[in-house]
Amino acid sequence: MASMRDIKRRKESIQSTGQITKAMKLVSTVKLQKAKSKAENAKPYFDHMYDTVLNMLRKSGNISHPYLSAGKSNKKAIIVITSNRGLAGGYNSNILKLVMSSDINKEDAVVYAVGRKGKEALARRGYHIAKDYSEVMNAPIYKDAIEIGKAVLDAFVADEVGEIYLAYTSFKNTVSHEPTLIKLLPVDMEAALQEGEKSEDLNERLTLMNYEPAAEEALNLIIPKYINSLIYGALVQALASENGARMQAMDSATNNAEDMISDLSLKYNRARQSSITQELTEIIAGANAIN
């Protein structure tokens, strides 16, 4: 059995750790609310961009445009959004598992890493890291999405990559986050039109939309903005998911610390009781020996 001194030291150590995890939980909660607010405020703009692209595709018929067909290259650009820090449960490992289990072969992947954890993990596994945007996840803004979007679009137009994908963690609510992989380019026209048919109010929302110049030229302007909006939406959702995951992890760690402290307190009291009993037994035995 551990001595009372050992138990006391371990209890104090766990109490100190519990205070840290509790503080980290509170910080993550505040950051989560800020990121969640960002995502909610930006959603109307992103929805409008999606509706605009969908409407253009519906009205254009069999339009031919580079953004609607795969490039000549077999390489596939993939924007992978993870965090710069750990202590977030399975947040980073889940998105990495999604990327590595996807149909994108390691040999064909050209990774645009957003987040240090993802960059380091994929580099160790032999993935080609084209660009590193880890600093973005400290406080993502729309300008960051424009920079990332321009980099992948330039590679697509130059036929350095034939397809562009985006891997991030979709924020559902405080406790639910879903690793997600979507194709950005080429735009899947058939899937987009099918999605449009499911939308009951789409026609009502888009009746006043007309395009000047022609649809082909308009796509040159709209698609980059559409891609940027998807990337920014993914950044803020990923940030909210990261802090939600960290909040849950720290809450679980704090609860575990409290359980361990309770268990150690019980062990300490038992050890103390045993020590007192032993001392009393020795005193009584000594008194009997004198008598």
Curated annotation (Swiss-Prot):
Compartment list: Cell membrane
Domain of life: Bacteria
InterPro entries in the record: ATP_synth_F1_ATPase_gsu (IPR035968), ATP_synth_F1_gsu (IPR000131), ATP_synth_F1_gsu_CS (IPR023632)
CDD domains the UniProt entry points to: F1-ATPase_gamma
Record keywords, A-Z: ATP synthesis, Cell membrane, CF(1), Hydrogen ion transport, Ion transport, Membrane, Transport
GO cellular component terms given for this protein: plasma membrane; proton-transporting ATP synthase complex
Function comment: Produces ATP from ADP in the presence of a proton gradient across the membrane. The gamma chain is believed to be important in regulating ATPase activity and the flow of protons through the CF(0) complex.
GO BP term, pick one: proton motive force-driven plasma membrane ATP synthesis
Name the record gives this protein: ATP synthase gamma chain
Quaternary organization: F-type ATPases have 2 components, CF(1) - the catalytic core - and CF(0) - the membrane proton channel. CF(1) has five subunits: alpha(3), beta(3), gamma(1), delta(1), epsilon(1). CF(0) has three main subunits: a, b and c.
Main location: membrane
Signal peptide: none
Native source organism of the sequence: Lachnoclostridium phytofermentans (strain ATCC 700394 / DSM 18823 / ISDg) (Clostridium phytofermentans)
Statement: the UniProt record of this protein carries the keyword Disulfide bond: no
Gene name as annotated: atpG
Topology relative to the membrane: Peripheral membrane protein
Record-stated family: Belongs to the ATPase gamma chain family.
GO molecular function list: ATP binding; proton-transporting ATP synthase activity, rotational mechanism
